[in-house]
Amino acid sequence: MLDIQQLVKTYENGHQAVKGVDLAIHQGEFIVLVGPSGCGKSSILRSIAGLEAITSGEIHLAGRRVDNEKPANRDIAMVFQNYALYPHMSVYDNLAYGLKNRGVSKATIAEKIAKVAKTLKIEEYLDRKPAKLSGGQRQRVAMGRAIVRDPQLFLFDEPLSNLDAALRAHMRLEIKKLQRELGVTSVYVTHDQVEAMTLADRIVVLKQGEIEQIGTPAEVYHQPASTFVASFIGSPAMNFLAASIRDGKLQLAGKQWSVPYDANLNCNTLTLGIRPEHASLQPVDDAIELSINIQVVEPLGPNQLVHGKINGEYGDEDFIAVTAEMPLTIGDNLPIWVRVEQLHLFDEQEKRIPISAQSPSVDTRQQQRQQQ
C-alpha cells in the first residue's frame, strides 16, 4: 500500500537524517516509527507527506509514485502535535475548511462533518472556537479534520505529546479504536515506547537514520535485534551484564550454566540481557541463579522496583528487578532466578545471538505456559 524505497534525506548543512530506508506498509496497517530524537522518524514522516523534499529514493502510495507530487495531491491527511487548528474559526469551520477548498458541496460537507462529529463525540463543540476546548478536545478536532478528507493514508506526528499522562492514555485508546473502525493505513511517529507498544501492528525502531528492527510489539520486545532495541523497548529498560560463553555454557562471575545456543559457540566478550520483570524470587527449572545486593527499593503499589548491584563477569554491575510488594532491607542480598529461555545474548557488535537449539524440556515448558 505504502512502499518506501531507498529513501535518503540530507539537509543543506550536510546532515544525513535518513540513510537508505526501505519500508513496505500493508493496507489498513498501523505502523509506528519510534526512536530517540535525531533518529530520522520525523524526517521520514514529513517526506511521506511532501512537507520535505527527499534527496533520493522513491515513495509509492497505492501503486502510484507520489514523492514528485505536491502534498495536496498525495491523498494523505496529517495530524500534528500542536493540533494546527485555525484559532479564529469554529470547530465546524475548521473541519470544513479543507473540503471547501476542494469544491465539495455544502450538503456533502455537512453530512461528512455530522458523521465525523458523532464518531469523535464532538457534536456539542461544533460552534466553539479552539481556545474554548481542552487539549483532548482539540486533538479530537484535529483528527476529525483529517478523517473528513477520507484519505488513503493517515500520518500522526507525535499527536499526544502536549497532553498530560492520564489524557494520553485515554487518547491512545481512542486512536486505536478509531483506526480499527476506519481501517485506514496509518503511520504514527513517537519517541514514547509505550505508545509504540500499545498502538502498533508493527513497530519500526530507528537509530541514526537507519532501521534497527521491524516487527510486531511482541517481536521487538521478546526478540530485540540489538542492545539498542532491547534498551529502548520495555520499561524499566533491560539489564545488561558482561558475560562469556564456552561450548554452549554461559560463564558469569565464576559460574556456568547450559543455555540453548550453538554448542560450538565461543565468545569471550558478550552482553547478557535480562528484563527486570523476568527476575523470579522463587527457584524455577532451567534457570540461572543470581544475587542482587539491594541499594534502593521503589514501591509502586502492586509491585516494586529493586535497584542493586549484581556480580558480573568484570565486577559489580547495576541491576533492576521488578518484584511483588514485600519488605526488603537495604544492603541485603536478594537471590533471583531467570529462565534460560528469557535470557538475551548479544555479540561484540551488540547484535542478537539467536537461539539455535532449544532443549525439549524448555520447549515443552514454553508450550505448557502458553496453554495456561
From Swiss-Prot:
Superkingdom of source: Bacteria
Q: According to the UniProt entry, what is the EC number of this protein?
A: 7.6.2.10
Coiled-coil stretches, from where to where? none
* Family to which the UniProt record says this protein belongs: Belongs to the ABC transporter superfamily. sn-glycerol-3-phosphate importer (TC 3.A.1.1.3) family.
In which broad location class does this protein mainly occur, judging by the first location in its UniProt entry?
Answer: membrane
Alphabetical list of Pfam families matching this protein = ABC_tran, OB_MalK
Please give the PROSITE patterns that the UniProt record associates with this protein.
ABC_TRANSPORTER_1, ABC_TRANSPORTER_2, UGPC
Instruction: Give an example GO molecular function.
Output: ATP binding
Q: Cross-referenced SUPFAM superfamilies, in alphabetical order?
A: MOP-like, P-loop containing nucleoside triphosphate hydrolases
Species per Swiss-Prot/TrEMBL record: Vibrio vulnificus (strain CMCP6)
Name listed for the protein in its UniProt record: sn-glycerol-3-phosphate import ATP-binding protein UgpC
Could you say which enzyme class this protein belongs to?
Answer: translocase
Record-level GO BP terms: carbohydrate transport; glycerophosphodiester transmembrane transport
Q: What residues does the ABC transporter domain cover?
A: 2-233
Can the keyword ATP-binding be found in this entry's annotation?
Answer: yes
NCBIfam families, sorted: PRK11650.1
